[in-house]
Design a protein with these regions (language model features):
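Extracytoplasmic/periplasmic, Sec-exported soluble proteins
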Residues: 18, 22, 39-43, 86, ...
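Non-transmembrane alpha-helical segments in soluble domains
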Residues: 1-2, 27-31, 48, 52, ...
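Mature extracytoplasmic/periplasmic domains
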Residues: 85-86, 90, 95-155
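Conserved C-terminal helix/tail region of periplasmic/extracytoplasmic solute-binding proteins
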Residues: 49, 151-182
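Periplasmic-binding protein-like
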Residues: 29-33, 72-96, 141
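Ligand-binding pocket segment of bilobal, Venus flytrap-like solute-binding proteins
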Residues: 1-4, 8-79
């Protein structure tokens, strides 16, 4: 929500006072528009059901859920917000004392091959960072991705940095106050 207000919370991650100031502004804005909120996140299935029935008209959600709904009903589309989508890339980690580091690298290299990564994408609905995999992804999923994320949207993704200790607690307290507000 901060990005839509022209604020950059990620730039304030190393300055707790500045981050707290941003969160206070976000809290005030969220309380101001609380009458537009039907519900708060409890799970993906609930969110998809609310959109399917038309009980809600817009939602903040992951792209894969939006693409699933679009496959069911072309009138429902997932679009990146003008202020920028939030982005992260799931990663692989090998423990320092791994018993078979060579096998771990072989597995990572295997699943990141474009053809294999595309199979995972086709099964999960989540897109992949494997370069060239889009050539092997089902056409409808690939087209939905391209419709949601044109080059401008990709260039405007706000990539999550590591979250410093204590900020998630602060965010949770803001959400508690927003939910409790009249």
């Amino acid at each position: 929500f901060a990005f839509a207000m022209g604020l950059d919370p990620f730039a304030a991650y190393d300055d707790r006072d500045q981050y707290e100031s941003i969160m206070a502004k976000v809290e005030d804005r969220l309380i101001d528009c609380k009458s537009n909120v039907k519900t708060y996140w409890t799970g993906g299935d609930q969110l998809l059901a609310l959109l399917r029935t038309g009980e809600v008209k817009a939602a903040m959600a992951w792209d894969a859920g939006g693409w699933k709904l679009n496959a069911e009903n072309p009138d429902i589309r997932f679009v990146a917000p003008e202020s920028g989508a939030l982005g992260w890339i799931d990663t692989f980690a090998i423990p320092r004392r791994s018993e078979n580091e060579e096998a771990a690298y072989k597995w990572i290299n295997f699943v990141m091959q474009p053809e294999i990564a595309a199979r995972i994408t086709n099964a999960s609905g989540n897109f992949t960072a494997s370069k060239g995999a889009d050539e092997f992804v089902k056409a409808d999923l690939r087209d939905a991705y391209r419709e949601s994320f044109d080059e401008a949207a990709i260039n405007n993704i706000k990539w999550y940095p590591p979250v410093p200790p204590g900020l998630e607690t602060m965010e949770g307290q803001v959400l508690d106050r927003v939910q409790a507000a009249n």
